[in-house]
Amino acid sequence: RTKSKFGARLEPGSHIDIQLYTGRTFDTVTQVESIFNYGEALTDDYSRWTIAGAILEAAERFTSHEHEPALQEFKLATGAMKALAENRYEPSMILDAYLLRSLAVGGYAPSLTNCSKCDAPGPHRYFSLVGGGSVCADCRPSASATPAPETLKLMSDLISGNWESAMESELRNRREANGLIAAYLQWHLERGLRSLQLVERA
């Protein structure tokens, strides 16, 4: 529960320093200091605003255990929001990079070079949601996808932060990466992000 005087500082996309009184059922906001309102910089751009919503929803899903610190996820989320607000890179690529890195922090990083089953050196032709990413011809499950090598290279660039290389990727590979990442995320979170349905991809 909160008092109305804190409303503006508690808008979606706000980076805040907050103090709470812990109650039996609900926590009560007692003090809020605004650090930066990323949402304010994004509200006039529908594409970036919906991507920000997807990042925030994902952050909530990746930090579902209350009262447990999640510093790495916090840094990833604020970094992604800052990059969006400053319009540093193509917005949907910021989202995909954030999702891949959050999966990695959670222990679900997809293998993008070696086979995720037998560790045979890659790159490999097949990608499996069930198998944990790239898989060789001998290990591939029947429902494996066959993404372009450039798509897996793009995903590797995004997870490692190699933006110079990522920005040189072609649109078809970005779109293919979008689909793989969304499907991989849904598999490991057991359900997809509702806000992804609203995201306008390039």
Label every model-predicted segment.
Residues 1-202:
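Non-catalytic alpha-helical scaffolds and adjoining flexible linkers that form interface surfaces
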